[in-house]
Amino acid sequence: TVGNGLFVTGKGEESHQINPSQTEEGVVYGQAVHRQEFGIYKGTFWSPKGSYLAFYRMDQSMVTDYPQVNTSTRIATLEPDKYPMAGMTSHKVTVGVYDVKTGKVIYLQAGDPTDRYFTNVSWSPDEQHIYVIELNRDQNHAQLVCYQAATGEREGVLYEEKNPKYVEPQHPLVFLPWDESKFIYQSQRDGFNHLYLMDTKAKGEGTWKNGKLE
């Protein structure tokens, strides 16, 4: 990323800008979103074979500025930061997919992103699907949603988790090398941090680890 833009460079090639070249005020591409919560520490996600690049697009033009002090300069200066205070309008996130071969970009058809968190982006081993754990702003209802990578079409919900207090997804899916239809899902749904063996072909909670151990 350069500034708020996202670029891709191949070996011996010039860099290609993925986002629109014109300036979009308050829009950031390819960087961590949602204040780096829910295990989010980056904003780009390469597919297993490098054919596609999924990325976050964060529109924070509707978020108010919060004054921060830059202490890295010799004389401290004020630098505004987009920070939504409790109950105020938060930024809106969408997930894009860049096709390396065609240079085209599509966006996952997730619906209105208002007051939603899009976390733990994962690729299927065959690069055909993208999985996103989506969370409401109240943080008490999470859904594991499957999308078509080539079109962005929403295929459906594989699993959902509710809790009257909160749900906090922290880890992307881990697919089994010997069975690409199976994956490991990490959750605290029973009060402890456990691993669950789940199947892309069957909706359900999965089973694996039980008991009062983490």
Where are these regions (language model features)?
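Short glycine-/Asp-/Thr-/Trp-enriched loop segments that recur within the blades
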Residues: 24-40, 113-118, 163-171, 214
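Predominantly five- to eight-bladed beta-propeller fold
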Residues: 18-45, 55-107
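Signature of short aromatic-glycine-proline-rich micro-motifs recurring in repeat-based ectodomains
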Residues: 31-48, 94, 120-122, 169-181
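Hydrophobic beta-strand positions in blades of beta-propellers and related beta-sheet-rich domains
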Residues: 6, 15, 53, 95-97, ...
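Beta-strand C-termini and the immediately following turn/loop, strongest in propeller blades
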Residues: 1-5, 10, 42-45, 54-60, ...
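Short loop/turn segments that connect beta-strands within beta-propeller blades
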Residues: 10-13, 99-103, 149-152, 199-203
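Beta-propeller fold detector
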Residues: 14-23, 106-109, 154-160, 205-211
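A conserved hydrophobic secondary-structure block that centers on an alpha-helix together
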Residues: 1-17, 21-25, 113, 119
